[in-house]
Amino acid sequence: METLASLYNEHLSTLQQRTRDVLERHQLDALLIHSGELQRIFLDDRDYPFKVNAQFKAWVPVTQVPNCWLWVDGVNTPKLWFYSPVDYWHCVEPLPDSFWTKAIDIQPLVNANDIAQLLPVQRERVAYIGYAQQRAQALGFSAENINPKPVLDYLHFYRSYKTDYELACMREAQKTAVAGHNAAHEAFLSGMSEFDINLAYLMATGQRDTDVPYDNIVALNEHSAVLHYTTLQHQPPAEIRSFLIDAGAEYNGYAADLTRTYVAGSKNTADSKNDFAALIKDLNNEQLGLIKTLKCGVNYTEYNVQMHQRIAKLLRTHNLVTGISEEAMVEQGITCPFLPHGLGHPLGLQVHDTAGFMQDDKGAHLSAPSKYPYLRCTRILQPRMVLTIEPGLYFIESLLAPWRSGEFSQHFNWDLIETLKPYGGIRIEDNIVIHENRVENMTRDLKLA
């Protein structure tokens, strides 16, 4: 098995080749990639938690240090100015010494403002990549060379194709996230509150709330019907019926994004609890069934439609919708209030990774179908793409309400829906890798139930 260092060197060669290509295409000499800067809270003397520029951490696994700069030209050894001030107020990161550092020319940057004197004088044909545009202007970058769209389009498009190093990092992120999910499940079974379940997850993964790749969704009962629920109640509800957790982790800047849904057990199990448990089981089977059909050369949008067909089957099988064919359910949009979000999204340096709608390296955009406006990917599946597959089935009153008085109202089993609404909803999410002749399910490979 190749070491992470050798995988990183191959990864760096790939990035260098992409850089040569994009520089030649746009008649540039180099890219100056900024890790970012701390952002001061308005009328305060504190800063918001630092979030690194994704294009920066694509090159080096430095995710917690602002004011770093990377100069790349595709030919010479990438040069990293690493921010290392003399500071007794804050902890200062030492100059890195790790598996990747021999491949990078690392220089200390003691004062953030010194970068102006350290950069090459001639930078008229250099593009700045980062979010501190005022800083770039102060360094003399012209407006057209600050985050030029054609350059970003190119870089974003090829980020969809993960190197072996990136895949190795993402598998490690999966391991951390799975450990957290198992700990959270145990906390749920012991009757803990949402707040305490989240703490159990963070403890098991060794993360703080500011470290996770996205805000953890830890939802009990009807809170599971709020797609991005992040409130975290401090007290458990009087009756715990269900639990949805959507939480991830990072490794060297690469994300995992996993979701599971569970039903609470009890000696006197209500019929509604049995119904909800059966829905979880069957949605899990449909999710796995869809994953088995994934293959190269097919647009992700097609699988989104197929998932709605599978949702229609569940609605009919569980008598949630009756007296209408599965085909008509999909055609008339009856599945949409039950599954209002898309099948999934690209995953990588960002949770909702770039280029989900991009059809080529020049930025051609293909929007989501009007019927499924929240789908986050319209790409044709190709080897080395990493995506989430996360179908759901929810009982959301604001989405169901228009159907109560609509022409198809008689087909909805409103009594059964009312009994299931207190459980909120279901989402099951795995992270998969597209290979030439197979699909790798990184999540199930780690036995996350």
Swiss-Prot record:
Q: EC number(s) per UniProt?
A: 3.4.13.9
What catalytic activity does the UniProt entry give for this protein?
A: Xaa-L-Pro dipeptide + H2O = an L-alpha-amino acid + L-proline
One GO BP on record is:
proteolysis
Q: Which InterPro entries match?
A: Creatin/AminoP/Spt16_N, Creatinase/aminopeptidase-like, PepQ_N, Pept_M24, Peptidase_M24B_aminopep-P_CS, X-Pro_dipept-like, X_Pro_dipept
CC terms in the record's Gene Ontology section: cytosol
Q: Where does Mn(2+) 1 bind?
A: D257, H345, E390, E429
Details of cofactor binding: Binds 2 manganese ions per subunit.
* Entry binding sites for Mn(2+) 2: D246, D257, E429
UniProt xrefs under SUPFAM superfamilies: Creatinase/aminopeptidase
Cofactor dependency: Mn(2+)
Keyword Cytoplasm listed? The answer is: no
A Gene Ontology MF term for this entry?
phosphoric triester hydrolase activity
> Would you say which domain of life the source belongs to?
Bacteria
Sorted alphabetically, the keyword list is: Dipeptidase, Hydrolase, Manganese, Metal-binding, Metalloprotease, Protease
Q: Which NCBIfam families match?
A: PRK13607.1
Member of which family?
Belongs to the peptidase M24B family. Bacterial-type prolidase subfamily.
The name on file for this protein is Xaa-Pro dipeptidase
Q: To which species is this protein native?
A: Yersinia enterocolitica serotype O:8 / biotype 1B (strain NCTC 13174 / 8081)
